[in-house]
A protein has these predicted regions:
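Outer-membrane beta-barrel proteins
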Residues: 1-175
Length: 175
């Protein structure tokens, strides 16, 4: 069993600041087994609402190839229409990584939709203290698809910096 506690100047998720520039306090409580099975809860404070996430997964390695399959439920007690769930598959090899986040279950974002078909994909590379990640969100709900590039630098194991830029966006409008 392990835990974490942190503070951030914003809630940075999938290339966007979703906290409207507000500082965040976050923490987790995790259980992991030597077999590769793990589960946990993560939570954050936000000014308008609180979020807690529940997750379970299994990860391991076959030689130099790492793999992970997990399920996560994002929960917003004060805004249940924004709750969503995803199945995540990730692979890594020699500093390279790739992941797919596949929307399942109920979904809201303030709409009447209950069918989450949103998908998010990433490819990345890390070397020493530097990292680059390209993420693409394919949103079914309102066609606000976008691609972002993140550049990161880890000053220490506990302090890192990430810059992100949305490089391609489709706001769903015609024309």
């Amino acid at each position: 069993i392990s835990g974490s506690l942190g503070i951030s100047n914003m809630y940075f998720w999938r290339g966007q600041d979703i906290s409207n520039g507000g500082a965040q306090v976050f923490g987790s409580l995790d259980y992991s087994h030597s077999s590769g099975l793990y589960a946990g809860v993560w939570g954050s404070s936000e000014t308008d609402t609180t979020e807690y996430d529940l997750y379970v997964g299994y990860g391991g390695a076959l030689g130099d190839l790492s793999y992970d399959l997990s399920y996560i439920s994002y929960n917003y007690p004060n805004d249940t229409e924004s709750d969503l769930q995803e199945v995540i598959l990730s692979l890594g090899y020699a500093g390279f990584s790739a992941a797919g986040y596949f929307g399942v279950g109920d979904y809201g974002h303030g709409s009447d939709s209950t069918d989450n078909k949103d998908n998010y994909f990433t490819v990345g590379y890390s070397y020493d203290k530097y990292s680059v990640l390209v993420g693409t969100w394919d949103r079914d709900e309102d066609d606000t698809n976008y691609t972002h590039v993140d550049l990161g630098y880890a000053l220490t194991d506990n302090l890192s910096f990430t810059g992100s830029k949305i490089v391609d966006a489709d706001d769903g409008s015609e024309g």
